[in-house]
Amino acid sequence: MAFKYLLPLLLLSLLVANCASRPLYRLPSEAKHATKKPLQTSRPYNLAHRGSNGELPEETAPAYMRAIEEGADFIETDILSSKDGVLICHHDVNLDDTTDVADHKEFADRKRTYEVQGMNMTGFFTVDFTLKELKTLGAKQRYPFRDQQYNGKFPIITFDEYISIALDAPRVVGIYPEIKNPVFMNQQVKWADGKKFEDKFVETLKKYGYKGSYLSEDWLKQPIFIQSFAATSLVYISNMTDSPKLFLIDDVTILTEDTNKTYAEITSDAYLDYIKPYVIGIGPWKDTIVPVNNNRLMTPTDLVARAHSRNLQVHPYTYRNENQFLHLEFNQDPYLEYDYWLNKIGVDGLFTDFTGSLHNYQELKSPLPQQQ
């Protein structure tokens, strides 16, 4: 990373640690909206998966700011809750793999075992820590082969702080929050007003003015996609917000967290017809679209064609640049992978850990018009 980015990110980490009670980033006025460069809608979306987490610890403020700087159309996050009911940005329900919680001896007695999606999981869980306690933890890189120099330097951020980063960007940047593990969140966290996790999620979005159907004037001003692996959550919030929603799809052998169906059943024509009134697209694991055997691509399924025939967008996940994530056909070249998915498979957006790489590819192959 160039030095010009390092000092601002380190200074930001200090601000985040000391200003947890409010959004950290100056929110733009209504007048500023009109002067911002608009969201591009002429080519598939560059979706910053947990921020630019190929370079910086995932779901931290610097990772999101870096992704915006590199050209992300949307910054993606996972929403969970703290013990005291504050919505936070963190992918896993436990803290073990992406924070330094194990180094905090004061929390040694917080280790628990919970059943999560039908499996027993042991570790340190977000639902056993207040926001104040979570803010003392430092984020770290999930993968040991990625840059470790920023481990422990950046804290967990709240949903409000994440939104503020997008709203204060120098151009219009969309948000892509996930209603993460809603069954577990509703089991473990109880809000004083009797509301559910999904209620709190939507309330936060409304507080910041997110509304409007896909490509509407309101949506273009503050773009958003709401995502979840739990179809019941997307159906539940459908009467609360008209913001566009996408249904996430995992490996076909896995059971959904909120029903007893496998994702093989979820990708059937009948289920796509059922979910279509509630969503504008699906977000499948890429190997669900194109199966893989011995790291080689098999014959693509017809999932994209069946989704497109129903006017559903397709945003697969996750595109990573490292060799161990690239199938043999791509000869260790992420540009070949982008070309395959965007031009042969024909998807509508890519979730990537390397926003800058995808942006550079798109600018090379399909540069935006000058006004965008």
From Swiss-Prot:
UniProt tissue specificity: Expressed in flowers and siliques.
Residue ranges constituting the GP-PDE domain according to the UniProt record: 44-362
Conditions for induction: By phosphate starvation.
Residues bearing attached sugar chains per UniProt: 120, 239, 260
SUPFAM superfamilies named in the record: PLC-like phosphodiesterases (SSF51695)
Keywords in alphabetical order: Glycerol metabolism, Glycoprotein, Hydrolase, Signal
EC number, UniProt record: 3.1.4.46
PROSITE patterns: GP_PDE
Molecular-function GO terms, alphabetical: glycerophosphodiester phosphodiesterase activity
Hydrolase is among the record's keywords: yes
Reactions listed under catalytic activity: a sn-glycero-3-phosphodiester + H2O = an alcohol + sn-glycerol 3-phosphate + H(+)
Signal peptide stretch: 1-21
Region (Disordered): 32-58
Any single biological process term in GO: glycerol metabolic process
PANTHER family hit by this protein: GLYCEROPHOSPHODIESTER PHOSPHODIESTERASE GDPD6, GLYCEROPHOSPHORYL DIESTER PHOSPHODIESTERASE
Family per similarity comment: Belongs to the glycerophosphoryl diester phosphodiesterase family.
Protein name: Glycerophosphodiester phosphodiesterase GDPD6
Species of the source: Arabidopsis thaliana (Mouse-ear cress)
Protein's gene: GDPD6
